[in-house]
Amino acid sequence: MKTTELRQKDVAGLQAEVKELQKAHFGLRMQKATQQLNNTATLRSTRRDIARAKTILVEKQSAETSAK
């Protein structure tokens, strides 16, 4: 997912996105454990997408608290 798409979402949307990505990552890990995953690069990209979403989420949360 692109950072521009993530930055357009609000805090609740980002939290939902992080949960969705974590579920997807868990599913990929289970596929890898049972040797059903063909493209292991998806694990890396999903993990990095989670990190991007969490980073932007923290930025937005800190911006909200500093604005108050």
From Swiss-Prot:
SUPFAM superfamilies reported for this sequence: Ribosomal protein L29 (L29p)
GO terms (BP aspect): translation
UniProt keyword Nucleotide-binding present: no
PROSITE patterns documented for this protein: RIBOSOMAL_L29
Keyword Kinase: no
One CC-aspect GO term: cytosolic large ribosomal subunit
Record-level Gene Ontology MF annotations: structural constituent of ribosome
NCBIfam families linked: L29
This protein's name: Large ribosomal subunit protein uL29
Species of the source: Albidiferax ferrireducens (strain ATCC BAA-621 / DSM 15236 / T118)
